[in-house]
Amino acid sequence: MVDSSTVLIFLLVLGGGQSELDTKITSSGEAAEWEDPDLSLQGSCQPVPSCQKCILSHPSCAWCKQLNFTASGEAEARRCARREELLARGCPAQELEEPRGRQEVLQDKPLSQGDRGEGATQLAPQRIRVTLRPGEPQKFRVRFLRAAGYPVDLYYLMDLSYSMKDDLERVRQLGHALLVRLQEVTHSVRIGFGSFVDKTVLPFVSTVPSKLHHPCPSRLERCQPPFSFHHVLSLTGDAQAFEREVGRQNVSGNLDSPEGGFDAILQAALCQEQIGWRNVSRLLVFTSDDTFHTAGDGKLGGIFMPSDGRCHLDSNGVYTNSAEFDYPSVGQVAQALTAANIQPIFAVTGATLPVYQELRQLIPKSAVGELSEDSSNVVQLIMDAYDSLSSTVTLEHSPLPPGVSISFESHCKGPEKTEGEAGDRGQCNDVRVNQTVDFWVTLQATHCLPEAHVLRLWALGFSEELTVELHTVCDCNCGDAQPHAPYCSDGQGDLQCGICSCAPGRLGQLCECSEADLSSPDLESGCRAPNGTGPLCSGKGRCQCGRCSCSGQSSGRLCECDDASCERHEGILCGGFGHCQCGVCHCHANHTGRACECSKSVDSCVSPEGGLCSGHGYCKCNRCQCLDGYYGALCDQCLGCKSPCEQYRDCAECGAFGTGPLAANCSVVCADVNVTLTLAPNLDDGWCKERTIDNQLFFFLVEHAASGIVLRVRPQEKGVDHTRAIILGCTGGIVAVGLGLVLAYRLSVEIYDRREYRRFEKEQQQLNWKQDNNPLYKSAITTTVNPRFQGTNGRSPSLSLTREAD
């Protein structure tokens, strides 16, 4: 006997596989509806089966939570649409669930100068909460006031290699002069001092014991052993202490040209307690006469461990781990300076200035100045750099969480603005004391954040910051959650946001049927046409508990209506001037047509004289339909008729220049024409181009005014006849080019001949003539000796035979 489930599966295959078996759903109630979005409407609001998915699908989407909002056979996903569409379909405004992003200012102390810079409020607001809906930007304003006399901490970091010997003598007397100059702009200033040379390993310094003890060239000079970085003096307001500690310093020495300045900068930025940085403007003056080592150079000395980005100063202020960690990279240095809110000033000699100017592009809010050979201009250099850095306001941000973007609009001088790219900084230059600048910050999220994120915004070089509490809205707050709701078939499901989430084993829009009823033919009959033929739900949905659950934009008892099948105009459904309902466009009040493509307005058909299509046609869909023989946008032109340019040419000529065929009676013939001279900046297609009776070109524009015809004529430009100059110039140019080619040819031949002659002379000098035999020559004389013949003197005479060579 054949199992009933086998028969059912066989029938499903014959019927295209559409059955209630396809509609089994979980307790969430979402799998009963499929998604079939119109691909031509990607990026707009598409039907989705839940409120949460709806608000996350597109920022323009809203959800109608009204009970019984969807019609019979209409998918619950139709609750998701644009606000205007839902209101037009009868959803009350109070039943719309459309959470929006929002902002809440938590702390906003007013901007103030404070007492001589102390206690100033330069950045406002101080704390804000921003809630983002994915895809929807949120924009808020940040204000900055440059206060006068803002406190400054300045740390002087000096290269003490031997080549900086004369510079050290200047710096020993620097403390008082530097404090005096800085106190001119701020009453609260502190200075500190640190020095550097290089890593104490080969090949950076000599490891010969005597050289390690005294690396200077002369044994008579005062010299200290090489070191990487030494923090000498913490930040202080005592100028005498600065000069006293610097006076105790001596130069050192190393082998290679680049110095270990990056190690020193990184430690000065990381060891904030040892340096004594306050929460004020921080300046780091870096002086050197050479370039710097960077990440990877340490491998030359057998150092492979990358810099760990931590402070490694001992109790004496010496960087003790220089032989263990490689030099930091430019990115590490820039990140450490930015995190510590330190503004570096690179005071370097002219030979290395281009290198540090390139480095300046990679480190935010840094300055570069050219140092004289003996550092005599260092005070003025520092003051110039301080003025430049203080007048530049750069709004920086902490790292963003994944999926969140940021952009800036900098309003530096009134309404003028400079837009930055996403992730860029806001910046204003040349900001004066007591001047306020605005930054508009835009935040946008692409998806939900797993948890709240704290974002910091601050102006580089200043201590204040704005804290942004970043949240995302990713769920609906319908307020109608009801477990075992009577609305859902007497408690067969939970009600939330207007739809039922069925209990296990229950199905349907209202959880009205069970899984045991899926194979009932009576249920499927409710999803077919009365004649019993055709696919279930017209092939546009699924049969669910004897009722059709339609997909996409389909609706109706049998999903026979498709709200996305209406005609389109210029690729837009119903031309954008109506809504589609069951395959028919229902147009707005001022439009008509199968695709609402026809406007009932006649504004584009009215001619300047006030007539409709110039009296030579009729207006249809806000466009003139001309009668036979007429053409033009307003039917104002005809075959054989004069164009406006031809019609008013003589009046324009006589009225503007007093010439032409109408010059004698211009005021009579052209009485209804007003001619004015004008200097048009450019001539577009509307200007007439005609010639006067003496063949001079002129331009005029025909305008229709209430008082009559107005001709705007452009005055003739009196030019100079350049014919002779053009002819002479062309002739002279041809002659000059010819002479140039001949001279170039003769010059190339002369150069070639001289080169060949020199080569010939060189070969003659290298010749070494000597006499030698021809290896192919064979002598014609042959000598033969008779071994048995004994002469009188005991010698065997030789017999010489002469033969001719072949």
From Swiss-Prot:
Organism for this UniProt entry: Mus musculus (Mouse)
Q: Where is the PSI domain?
A: 44-92
Residues where Mg(2+) binds: 161, 163, 259
Q: Which domain of life is it from?
A: Eukaryota
Domain comment (free text) = The VWFA domain (or beta I domain) contains three cation-binding sites: the ligand-associated metal ion-binding site (LIMBS or SyMBS), the metal ion-dependent adhesion site (MIDAS), and the adjacent MIDAS site (ADMIDAS). This domain is also part of the ligand-binding site. The MIDAS site is required for both rolling and adhesion. The ADMIDAS site is required for rolling and mediates the negative regulatory effects of higher Ca(2+) concentration on ligand binding. The LIMBS site is required for adhesion and mediates the positive regulatory effects of low Ca(2+) concentrations on ligand binding.
The main place the protein resides is membrane
Ranges for region Disordered: 98-123, 786-806
Which cysteine residues pair off into disulfide bonds?
51-476, 54-80, 64-91, 216-223, 271-311, 412-428, 448-474, 478-497, 488-500, 502-511, 513-545, 527-543, 537-548, 550-559, 561-582, 566-580, 574-585, 587-596, 598-621, 605-619, 613-624, 626-635, 638-641, 645-688, 651-670, 654-666
Cytoplasmic topological segments: 746-806
What name is this protein filed under? Integrin beta-7
Instruction: Cite the InterPro entries for this sequence.
Output: EGF_extracell, I-EGF_1, Integrin_beta_N, Integrin_bsu, Integrin_bsu_cyt_dom, Integrin_bsu_tail, Integrin_bsu_tail_dom_sf, Integrin_bsu_VWA
Report the residue ranges that make up the VWFA domain in this protein. 150-389
